[in-house]
Structures are given as C-alpha cells and as structure tokens.
Amino acid sequence: MLRIVPPKEIQGEVIAPPSKSYTHRGYFLSLLADEKSIVERPLISDDTLATIDAIRAFGADLIEEVVYPPEELRPNYIFARDSGTTARISIIVSSLAKGVSVIDGREQLRRRPMEDGVSSLRMIGVEAIGKRLPVKVFGRGRISAKEVSIVAEKSSQFATGFLILAAKIGLKVEIVKPVSKPYIEMTLKTMEEFGVKYDKAQENERLVIFVDPGVKGTKFKVPGDYSSAANFLVAGALYGKIRVRNLMRDDVQADKEILNILREYGAKVKVKDEYVEVESNERNPLNVDCSNFPDLFPLLAVLAAYAEGKSVIRGRQLRIKESDRIHAMAVNLSRAGIRVRELSDGLEIWGGQPKGFRGKTFNDHRITMALAILALGAKGESIIPETKSIAKSYPNFFEDLMRVIK
C-alpha cells in the first residue's frame, strides 16, 4: 500500500529507462540473426524477462548483453507471463521451430484475443489452435509461402511478429486496418538496425511491406522509453518543471506524441538533443484519439482531470489492454471527485480539482503509474493499495518519482 500526500514542490531531473518495445524487438531479431548480436542497455522488467525466457526456450544463448542465435529454432513451451508482445511475437516466430510449441501466459494475458495471428498463420500453411492463450503452434521449420495478410485493428503486435518472421524468410506482409501505426514503424526501424531491407506501400486501409530475407547480427543500443518518461512529462505539465534525459529527438516511438499533446494542453515544452523539459502553464481541455498511442490513455485522462473544461479522450482498443482502461480510469477519476462519462471507446471528462482518493489499479501498470501522478496534485491524501504491477514495465518508477518530489 502506498500513501501519497501532495508535495510542496515538484521539480527535478530523471533519466528515462530503456524502451520496453525496442527491447522486445531487439531480442527477437537477435534470435533470428545470422550471428551473435549485442542488445545494449536493455530494459529489465517482467515483460522483457518474459521475452528473454522465450528466446532462450527457442534455443538462443544469452550471456549478459550478448545473444547467440541457434542454428535452428527448437519447439518449446513459452510462458509469456503478462506480456502481450512476447506472446504474440512468439506465436508467429514458433512457426519456424519444427514441432509443437505452446504459448501461454498468466490469467490476465489469457483474456486477450489471439485469433487474428492464429488465422494468419494458417494462410502460410502453419497449423495453430487457440483463440486465446494457450495457443498451440505446429511449426513447419521451413515456410514456402511468399505472402501473408494480418488484420491489425485490435493490436499491431501480430503485425510486428510477421514482420520479424519476414525478416528471416522473406515475405510480403499485408497489414489490414493497422492500429498503433507508430509501433509498426518502430519495428521497421529496428529491422533496419539489423540490416533488413524492405519496401512499403500504403493501399487504402492496407499497409503492404515487402521484406527481403536476412537478419544480420549487430550491436543494437536500446533507446530511452517515451512511454515511461511520459509520466514525468505529464507531472511537469501539471505541477512544476521536470527534465527527462535519454530520449531521442528523432525517435519514431508512438508515445513521443505526448510532446504535441502537452503543447496543446498549454504546457511549456522544450526539446533538446540531450533532454526534454516540460513546465506547467495553462491547462486546456483535450480532444484526442489515442488509437495510435493507447498506452498514453491513462495519463491523458489525468491531464483531463485537471483541465479547465470538458475533454474527450478516445481509442479503439482501450478495453482490451492489460485492463479495460476506459472503465478503470472512469472508476478512479470518479473516486477523485471528477465528473466523467464512459463512452464505448473512451471518456468524457469534466476537469476540476481532484480530491484525495483510494485508487484501484486493476493490476495494470499504466493505471498504477497514472494514479500516482493524479495523486500528486489532489486535495488530500491518496492511497494506492497495489503497486507491484509496475514491475511489468518500470520497476524503478517510484524511486525515480521521489527524485522530483521536494
């Protein structure tokens, strides 16, 4: 249990942790590379440990930051913990392991949909069973198919899985109704780091990517994480001034969009090569569709709770993340005395002065961190009964938070 009393001042500097999304991609591409790779400064969290376990199960050796890929992937039991990225990429990559692989996870992950990836595996001649975890894949070892189509309106993670598979075998990947497009761009950017060549074209609601085979062993330095840094950037926009280092100015991460949103909110945003700095100023209401950056939704709801007016925050896949994030934030904002109306795809939020509250995290790391940021400016003491969920993506979050509380 964590008790938060609003501090007198919020100001300081933190270093953004390594990116979870890039860490996943770097490890899976290292698994399929032609020789050893170095994944430099990876994020170590529950989700990325699941990916480390997965690539080892497929036959890779990992010694400190060096990944030695196997000559051939071996079929195995993959336990993805609560990591949707680990599970979905493993389902696709296991098609290269000749034999039966089973991909499973914890109860929370077992509730998330897997049928789109399973259906697309069948298109390339790979039998797979399961609409949700556990999923059983009957790997072929060698795949002769030349193209695949994946519906990505619920998640871009299977699209990433097929792009990583394509980097190994060569494949035309058609992504239908892609949601979270920046995550696909992040996958392509990481593939480039591993020497993968590709061409892409946009055709109406389809993104078509022609990927040449060949993943080269490389030294891949994991960039800082805009998703985790967003917690502190939002805190700066609301309460004081915070500087975050280790963020790439030209990154394609989806959650880099937080910088544009904070400018719209009225905050002072300074972007340099060495850091990003955000200082509080105005608190304008927001109207945002976060379908391309769903992990920002809880923090955008926090911004809206303090805004001067009515905000609308929407996103297509918000109900099928680690929790139903729309409902989760509606519950918590209501407990903080903020008027909120739940929509099918988002929230209407009438901003004001949140009061101290007893939060409910729904065992969702993003909700937990957002509630901590919400509590910093609330009128009175707030209680967050569960904080273990942050281990999924940002184990040192509360230690870093203490650096900016005066």
Swiss-Prot record:
Annotated residues for binding of phosphoenolpyruvate: K20, G84, R112, Q157, R325, R366, K392
GO cellular component assignments: cytoplasm
This protein's record includes keyword Transferase: yes
EC number in record: 2.5.1.19
Residues annotated as catalytic: D295 (proton acceptor)
Top-rank lineage group of the source organism: Archaea
Positions with a binding annotation for 3-phosphoshikimate: K20, S21, R25, S155, S156, Q157, D295, Q317, K321
Keyword Chaperone included in the entry's annotation: no
Enzyme class, first EC level, given as a word: transferase
GO biological process: one example: chorismate biosynthetic process
GO molecular function: 3-phosphoshikimate 1-carboxyvinyltransferase activity
Intracellular or extracellular location(s): Cytoplasm
Reaction(s) catalysed (UniProt annotation): 3-phosphoshikimate + phosphoenolpyruvate = 5-O-(1-carboxyvinyl)-3-phosphoshikimate + phosphate
InterPro entries: Enolpyruvate_Tfrase_dom, Enolpyruvate_Tfrase_sf, EPSP_synthase, EPSP_synthase_CS, RNA3'P_cycl/enolpyr_Trfase_a/b
Pathway: Metabolic intermediate biosynthesis; chorismate biosynthesis
Keywords attached to this entry: Amino-acid biosynthesis, Aromatic amino acid biosynthesis, Cytoplasm, Transferase
NCBIfam families tied to this protein: aroA
Subunit: Monomer.
Function per UniProt: Catalyzes the transfer of the enolpyruvyl moiety of phosphoenolpyruvate (PEP) to the 5-hydroxyl of shikimate-3-phosphate (S3P) to produce enolpyruvyl shikimate-3-phosphate and inorganic phosphate.
Family: Belongs to the EPSP synthase family.
Protein name: 3-phosphoshikimate 1-carboxyvinyltransferase
Organism, scientific name: Pyrococcus furiosus (strain ATCC 43587 / DSM 3638 / JCM 8422 / Vc1)
Gene giving rise to this polypeptide: aroA
